[in-house]
């Protein structure tokens, strides 16, 4: 398979739903700090925006470094660049709905900073190489060569509580559009719930 990170081969293996995200809805985001690409420490449980969108991804490509062996054959491994770019491309629409976007991986800070600058990401990536955040939520991982990576998952939290989980995420380049659609539906449901009884008949 080609290793152009912006392209998804048509024969990528589809990840299965092994139930590794079933325990998350209703859980609080853990109050742990992780290093962000702007050099700050971020505590996702303290985010003040109405919604927090956290896409958890295995790892993005590093210039001049080959991906782990058989990376494309691991279900759900390939596609982190298209996924990240999909969130970049609808970032304004997500922000308009009150969502703050973050990406999280086990990659080191320097690799995330390089990737963020190269792809012009308008949101922060969070580095969790010791899996402190991941262990607090019991996020699923897999191993490739000597790398421990998170399985791809997207978490939508409202006021610090996980409201929705997308797992497995496939295809990854459609993730942001699916999140956007879910948030639009949530906004419509909120508007309907706040409408006075009989208001639709006026």
Each predicted region: which residue ranges?
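Chalcogenol-based redox active-site neighborhoods
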Residues: 1-202
